[in-house]
């Protein structure tokens, strides 16, 4: 009788170990997929300038003259802060980014965290700035409270034709995300 009980216990132990190993392998496969094969969906930069940013405000007393630009080229000047705050409950992004009046191009600002575009502004005309933008719907589910290394990606557009320039600028920023 004792031998049968021991065989039954051995069989149960082997079954449990087999199930645990199977669960471990499944967990490893899911982790590898999540880390290496899942792709984030990037926001494409428009080829032609989008609508003018509705939350942009005029810069205070920017009386500088336009920068000189070669024919067919452009010249830009940037004013920005490297600190960005995201409030998940208000769905607001607080930042400081300006396209000074001396620039010769319109700009579109993107905030990127871990290769995911978190926000894209409308077109910023020379002489305008933004200090607060709305967080797009659904982005609050992708972020958790804490600090992130991010970047501003600045896209340039010709003022006359609205065509996107072949160059862009990437600026490292520190993003602080809060719940309230």
Q: In which residue ranges do the predicted regions lie?
A:
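Short glycine/proline/serine/threonine-rich loop/turn segments at secondary-structure transition edges
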Residues: 139-149
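Primarily secretory-pathway and cell-envelope proteins
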Residues: 17-108, 160-180
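Generic structural detector for well-ordered beta-strands
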Residues: 123, 134, 174-176
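N-terminal Lys/Arg-rich, disordered targeting/topogenic segments
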Residues: 1-13
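Exposed aromatic-hydrophobic patches
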Residues: 129-139
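Conserved aromatic beta-strand anchor motif in extracellular beta-sandwich/beta-rich domains
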Residues: 109-113
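Solvent-exposed serine/threonine-rich low-complexity stretches and specific carbohydrate-binding patches
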Residues: 117-126
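Beta-strand-rich extracellular modules
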Residues: 151-159
